[in-house]
């Protein structure tokens, strides 16, 4: 168990870089959980036992049973059978009406006032005829223990008699079924855990749970009780009842100062009453892992203030045995399944449980990185089922990384928000070469490294696009603070005054934010003029506008003076090639 969990801890450290407070909280909880072998430290709620109550319950099987007997006996204030007449108003209180109580089996809400058993009387879950002694108002022990008693309709109590509970496949309402009595779907788990308690707390009195029909001080049917234990998990009423029986705050006059371990830790029941080879493995994904560990890496990109839709995952169970499991989600995450009172039933391999993972609005309130997780822990404590089974089943974790970005912002300027760029390509002469000028798109989002990348697409072009053009190609994932460089050009093929408008649409990176609308449109407005022009570049001397001997003389003088004005090839050297280039230009003449 520890080797597997230590490996998981290393993975946890590697994945979580201490960049978010909830990471540290989750990690602390994880470390505490590793401190014991069987004891599990749960998140606190109002019905939880004191942190140290089960601290010595670290074994399995008979050892664990003895440890639980000791825990439930230490400081136990035994109450009498007569005390239940008053204490029921506290621990069996109707949550919707404080002056009434809920009866076992039929769930009737009746006045809590004791009227000598006319409205309700005291049901021994473990029949008094199947345990030593007989009940009187002064009787203590299991006969007077409120964990082993329930308020009941008198006629229902009488009809049940001392029948054991059984018929594992029964469903629906309560009632006799031949040799056995069925407590009903609502109470079958509660009844099972009450009997588990009695057989542990009062084991020294000879109370024993058996399969089939019991005799003497025995009670059963254990197989049915165990199956019901996983089908009907501890609910709010049962947990409140357990805590109210124990609590000085809730029950100052009749508190027992002891608890039912099988309500607080339902995962203990299998090891105590079945065997040490629970075969369950829980996992996410399609294939059962050998060691039971499964992980999902969930990487999400979101914009500040956006809503992240819930996501569904399937938790699978392999093995025929039943098991309880715990689901914890980091702060900021919600889960449709949570806490430690979740169970997979017995004799049902291949079943699964959908888990919906939700995301609180706080995650996207600010730009930055959120790290959290949803962890599933198979709570079974047995270790002999093999690798990946029971307590050897390593936790299953959905790692959640959310990178929250400020929206991207496109601009033609790297220092300010410029949505329209007017680019004048000037005036050129016909046939003297195209004009060109560079321009860039910038991403100037807020948020630094958490400014969203942008995509830029050309959506329309109007005007003289045959003359004024751009070499633009679609921009994908332009990081914040980066630029994409392009150029605009004007053709020298025809004369005139030209203008063209190119409209570009800017999106937050569509590979990260596929459902987000566009951010804005940018416009590139191009203009320029192509003139018929004068003489060629060989027109070096007055009178300008004509080519004659004076232009030839001017060139020769410049060449002789080694003046680079005669460098018609623009290579920084005066030679024959410049003379040839001049003569070619001279040959072009004037229009």
Question: What is each model feature region?
Answer:
Residues 1-22:
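N-terminal secretory signal peptides that target proteins for export/translocation
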Residues 25-38:
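Bacterial N-terminal signal peptides
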Residues 115-276:
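Domain-level detector of nuclease and nuclease-like folds
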Residues 275-535:
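Feature for long, exposed domains in two main contexts
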Residues 530-591:
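Cellulosome-associated attachment modules in secreted, modular CAZymes
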């Amino acid at each position: 168990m520890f080797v597997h969990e230590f490996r998981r801890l290393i993975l946890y450290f590697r994945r979580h870089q201490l960049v978010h407070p909830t990471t540290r909280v989750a990690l602390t909880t994880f470390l505490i959980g590793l401190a014991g072998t069987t004891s599990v430290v749960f998140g606190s709620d109002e019905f939880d036992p004191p942190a140290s109550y089960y601290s010595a319950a670290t074994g399995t099987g008979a050892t664990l049973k003895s440890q639980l007997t000791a825990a439930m006996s230490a400081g136990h204030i035994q109450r009498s059978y007569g005390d239940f007449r008053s204490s029921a108003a506290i621990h069996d209180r109707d949550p919707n009406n404080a002056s009434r109580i809920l009866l076992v089996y039929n769930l009737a809400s009746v006045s809590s006032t004791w009227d000598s058993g006319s409205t309700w009387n005291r049901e021994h879950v473990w029949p008094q005829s199947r345990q030593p002694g007989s009940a009187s108002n002064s009787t203590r022990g299991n006969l007077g223990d409120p964990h082993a008693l329930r308020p009941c309709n008198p006629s229902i109590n009488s009809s049940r008699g001392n029948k054991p509970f059984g018929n594992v496949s029964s469903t629906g309402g309560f009632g006799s079924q031949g040799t056995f009595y069925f407590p009903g779907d609502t109470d079958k788990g509660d009844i099972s855990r009450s009997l588990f308690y009695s057989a542990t707390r009062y084991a020294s009195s000879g109370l024993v749970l058996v399969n089939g029909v019991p005799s003497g001080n025995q009670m059963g049917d254990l197989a049915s009780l165990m199956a019901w234990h996983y089908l009907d998990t501890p609910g709010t009423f049962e947990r409140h009842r357990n805590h109210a029986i124990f609590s000085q705050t809730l029950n100052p006059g009749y508190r027992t100062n002891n608890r039912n371990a099988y309500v607080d830790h339902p995962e203990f029941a299998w090891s105590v009453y079945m065997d040490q080879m629970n075969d369950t493995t829980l996992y996410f994904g399609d294939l059962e892992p050998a060691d039971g560990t499964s992980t999902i890496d969930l990487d999400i990109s979101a914009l500040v203030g956006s809503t992240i839709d819930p996501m569904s995952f399937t938790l699978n169970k392999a093995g025929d045995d039943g098991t309880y499991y715990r689901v914890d989600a980091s702060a900021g995450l919600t889960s449709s399944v949570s806490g430690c009172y979740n169970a997979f039933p017995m004799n049902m391999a291949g079943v699964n449980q959908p888990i919906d993972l939700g995301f609180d609005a706080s995650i996207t309130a600010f730009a930055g990185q959120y790290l959290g997780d949803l962890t599933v822990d198979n709570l079974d404590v047995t270790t002999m089922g093999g690798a990946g089974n029971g307590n050897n089943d390593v936790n299953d974790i959905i790692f959640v990384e959310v990178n929250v970005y400020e929206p991207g912002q496109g601009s033609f300027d790297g220092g300010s928000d410029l949505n329209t760029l007017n680019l004048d390509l000037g005036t050129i002469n016909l046939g003297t070469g195209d004009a060109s000028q560079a321009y860039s798109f910038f991403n100037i989002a807020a948020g630094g490294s958490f400014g969203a990348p942008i995509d830029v697409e050309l959506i329309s072009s109007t005007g003289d696009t045959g003359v004024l053009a751009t070499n633009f190609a679609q921009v994908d994932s332009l990081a914040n603070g980066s630029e994409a460089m392009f150029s605009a050009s004007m053709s020298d093929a025809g004369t005139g005054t030209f203008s063209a408008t190119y409209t570009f649409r800017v999106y937050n990176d569509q590979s990260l934010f596929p459902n987000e609308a566009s951010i804005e449109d940018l416009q590139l407005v191009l203009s320029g003029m192509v003139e018929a022009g004068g003489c060629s570049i060989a027109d070096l001397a007055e009178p300008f506008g004509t080519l004659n001997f004076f232009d030839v003389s001017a060139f020769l003088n410049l060449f002789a003076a080694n003046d680079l004005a005669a460098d018609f090839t623009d290579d920084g050297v005066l030679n024959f090639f410049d003379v040839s280039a001049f003569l070619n230009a001279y040959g072009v003449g004037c229009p």
